[in-house]
Amino acid sequence: MNNLPLLNDLRVFMLVARRAGFAAVAEELGVSPAFVSKRIALLEQTLNVVLLHRTTRRVTITEEGERIYEWAQRILQDVGQMMDELSDVRQVPQGMLRIISSFGFGRQVVAPALLALAKAYPQLELRFDVEDRLVDLVNEGVDLDIRIGDDIAPNLIARKLATNYRILCASPEFIAQHGAPKHLTDLSALPCLVIKERDHPFGVWQLRNKEGPHAIKVTGPLSSNHGEIVHQWCLDGQGIALRSWWDVSENIASGHLVQVLPEYYQPANVWAVYVSRLATSAKVRITVEFLRQYFAEHYPNFSLEHA
C-alpha cells in the first residue's frame, strides 16, 4: 500500500454505505454522483479491496467493506476527539456538527438559535436537518438531536434545554359550534386533529392531571404528520389539537385559540440528545449550553407551569 486513504474519502464511503447509493450522498454533499463514485474508486484502489457491490438499483457493502467501515468509524471518531481536545485547549469549538430536529420546532425555534450559534462560533460548521421521526444517531451519523418529548432511550445522553408542555386547544369558532368539552372522555365524540408525534403513538393522547396519567383514543376526519398543518387546521376551526405551548401560546394570548380542559397536559420538554462517545466533546458541550441559554433568553415564556 503506497498511500494512506484520505479522511474525506473514508467519510464519503461511510455515507454511501449508510445511504446504499451514490445519488443520495451526492445530494447531501452538494457534488455530482460521478464525483462520489470517483472518490470510492480511488479509496478502493488505495486499499486494494472492493468495498461495494454496484447494481443498477442499489449499492451494497462487501464483507471487506464492512471491516473497513468499522475501522473508518473508529478513525474518524478518534480524529473528531482529537479536534475536540484541541478545542478544549483553545476554548474555541470547531469542526462539523450535524444536528437534527423536528420540522416545526426546527424551523421556528432551533434554526434561529443555530444561526446565532454560528455567528458566535464561526469555526463551527453546522449541518442542520429536520425529520419528523426518531433517528438512529449512531448509524445515521447525527451528533445532536434537539427533540421534544421525555421518552429517551437509556443508552443516550440527554440534557434538558427547556420546560415545555402540550395542551389541548381549539378555535373560538369550533367551541361555538361544538361546545367545549367538560370531561376528558368528551374528546372521543369530538373531531380531533391527530398528528404523528416523534414520541407518542398515533391517535392516542397520553395526558396528565393532578390525579396522574390518562390515555384517551381520539379520532377525526383530518390527520397529518406535520405539526404546522395541524396548527393551521386548528386555527381554521376544524378540530381540537394537542400542541406544544411554545407553538400556540401567542395564538391563545391573541384569542385566536382557546385552551380546553386546562387541567390536562402532556409533558414535552426540550432535550439535547447525543451518544455517550460525545460526552467529552467540546463542541457538543458548548452547543448544548449555548442553546440552553438562548432558549432562556429568547423564550422566557417557553413553558406553561403546572403544579
Curated annotation (Swiss-Prot):
Q: Which GO terms describe its molecular function?
A: DNA-binding transcription factor activity; sequence-specific DNA binding
Q: Where are the transmembrane segments?
A: none
Q: Which UniProt keywords apply?
A: Activator, DNA-binding, Repressor, Transcription, Transcription regulation
Q: Which CDD domains match?
A: PBP2_CrgA_like_9
Domain HTH lysR-type, first and last residues per copy: 5-62
Which parts of this chain does the entry mark as a DNA-binding region?
22-41
Query: Which GO biological-process labels does this protein carry?
Result: DNA-templated transcription; malate metabolic process; negative regulation of DNA-templated transcription; positive regulation of DNA-templated transcription
User: InterPro entries, alphabetically?
Assistant: LysR_subst-bd, Tscrpt_reg_HTH_LysR, WH-like_DNA-bd_sf, WH_DNA-bd_sf
Cross-referenced Pfam families: HTH_1, LysR_substrate
Induction entry:
Expression of dmlR is subject to negative autoregulation under both aerobic and anaerobic growth conditions. Its level of expression is generally lower under anaerobic conditions than that under aerobic conditions.
UniProt-listed PROSITE patterns: HTH_LYSR
Highest rank taxon of the organism: Bacteria
Deletion phenotype, per the entry, is:
Deletion of dmlR inhibits aerobic growth on D-malate and inhibits the induction of dmlA expression by D-malate and L- and meso-tartrate.
Tell me the function of this protein.
Transcriptional regulator required for the aerobic growth on D-malate as the sole carbon source. Induces the expression of dmlA in response to D-malate or L- or meso-tartrate. Negatively regulates its own expression.
Family note: Belongs to the LysR transcriptional regulatory family.
Q: What is this protein called?
A: HTH-type transcriptional regulator DmlR
Q: Which organism is it from?
A: Escherichia coli (strain K12)
Q: Which gene encodes it?
A: dmlR
